[in-house]
Amino acid sequence: MTSKGPEEEHPSVTLFRQYLRIRTVQPKPDYGAAVAFFEETARQLGLGCQKVEVAPGYVVTVLTWPGTNPTLSSILLNSHTDVVPVFKEHWSHDPFEAFKDSEGYIYTRGAQDMKCVSIQYLEAVKRLKVEGHRFPRTIHMTFVPDEEVGGHQGMELFVQRHEFHALRAGFALDEGLANPTDAFTVFYSERSPWWVRVTSTGRPGHASRFMEDTAAEKLHKVVNSILAFREKEWQRLQSNPHLKEGSVTSVNLTKLEGGVAYNVVPATMSACFDFRVAPDVDMKAFEEQLQSWCQEAGEGVTFEFAQKFTEPRMTPTDDTDPWWAAFSGACKEMTLTLEPEIFPAATDSRYIRAVGIPALGFSPMNRTPVLLHDHNERLHEAVFLRGVDIYTRLVAALASVPALPGES
C-alpha cells in the first residue's frame, strides 16, 4: 500500500488527521477542543448538535440526523474522545502530530483507539446525506469522555440521564479491535472488570523473630489461591482452540503494598488484582469464591472492590435477530468475514447493554496489527478509508431495519 501526496490526500483522511491532533490524552484531556470540533462538524453537515454535561467538565456531544419515522427506535453510533497516555521517547514520530509516512501509515495516539471510528461515523453519514438518502430511523452519534479511565464520568452517568433516554436508542455500535488476518472481529459482549484489593492483618514485631500469624503469610495464601485459579483458566484457554481470550476469566496481580522498614514485620499488607470476569460466570458464586479464599487464609483477611461490574449482557448473534441480520447481512454483501467474540477488556458498550440496548463492538481494521495503547500506534489510510465505505453500508442497513414488534 502506498500513500497519495499531500495535494491528493482524501478529505476524509485530512479530517481524521485533524481530529487526531486534538490532545484528548489522559490524565488531562482537552475535551473542550474536541467538543468544538464536533460542533463545527455538525454545522457543516447540517446535523443537530446537543451538549450534555454529565459531570463538571465532562460533556457528551450528540450529533443527530433525524429519520423519517420518529416512532421507531434510533441507531446509536458511540465513540469515546479520550486517549491513553504516551511515552514519547518510544515513538518514531510526535504522537500527536498525525504524521503520515510515505507508505500511508498515520502515527498518532488514538489512530486505532478509537478516533478512526469517530470519523468513519461522520464520513459515512456525510456521504449518505450528500447522496440524498433518508432513512426511517434516526441516527445519533455520541462522542463521550472518560472511557479510558472507566467511563465513570462519561457513559456510566449518561445512560442514567433523561437526555440519553430521549434518544430512544434501539441498537448501538461502539469500538472493537483490529484483526491481523483477513477477517473482521465483532464483539457481542465483554468481560466484567473487577478490581479487588485484598487486605491482610497480622501480628507486627521485630523482623529478627519468627513471628506467627503475620499479615504476609496470610496474604501469601490468598495470592497463591488466586494465581492457581489464574493458571487453571490459562490452561483451559490453551487446551481449547475454539475458546478466545474473552471466553475465560483472567486475573493479574497488579500491586503489592505494605511495610514501613526492613526490620519491622508489618501489621497490614495488601494485594490488588485486576479480574476480567467472563459473561457466563455466576457473579454471586464467584464473589463467594473470593470470600472463601480469604477465609481459608486465616483471620483478619478481607477484600473490597475498587471497581465491580455485575451486569454483563450478550447481544444476539443469530439471524433471527433483526439487528444482527441487518449488520451481518450488510457485511456478507461486502464479502467481509466476521469473527464474533467476547471483548477481552471493557468498553462503554457495557453501560449501553446494561440498560437493555443491544450493542456490537466493531472497528473495521483487518490485516492490521492490534496497536491500541502501544508505542507507535498507527493505521494505514487505505484501511481507514475502507472503514468509511464499510460504515456507510452498515449505517444504511441498520437505519433501514423495519418496524419491530412494539414499534408503531
Swiss-Prot record:
One GO-annotated biological process of the protein: protein catabolic process
Function, as annotated: Involved in the hydrolysis of N-acylated or N-acetylated amino acids (except L-aspartate).
Residue sites binding Zn(2+) 2 per the record: 113, 148, 373
Cofactor(s), names only, from the UniProt record: Zn(2+)
Entry keyword set: Cytoplasm, Hydrolase, Metal-binding, Phosphoprotein, Zinc
This enzyme's EC code(s): 3.5.1.14
Record has Electron transport as a keyword: no
Tissue: Expressed in kidney.
Complex and partners: Homodimer.
Organism whose genome encodes this protein: Rattus norvegicus (Rat)
Disulfides per UniProt: none
MF GO annotations: aminoacylase activity; identical protein binding; metal ion binding
Domain of life: Eukaryota
Cofactor note: Binds 2 Zn(2+) ions per subunit.
Catalysed reactions listed for this entry: an N-acyl-L-amino acid + H2O = an L-alpha-amino acid + a carboxylate; an N-acetyl-L-cysteine-S-conjugate + H2O = an S-substituted L-cysteine + acetate
Modified residue annotations for Phosphoserine: 408
Family annotation (PANTHER family): AMINOACYLASE-1
UniProt enzyme class: hydrolase
Keyword Hydrolase attributed: yes
Similarity comment: Belongs to the peptidase M20A family.
One Gene Ontology term, aspect cellular component: cytoplasm
Annotated InterPro entries: Aminoacylase-1_M20A, ArgE/DapE_CS, Bact_exopeptidase_dim_dom, N-acyl_aa_amidohydrolase, Peptidase_M20, Peptidase_M20_dimer
Protein name: Aminoacylase-1B
Locations listed in the record: Cytoplasm
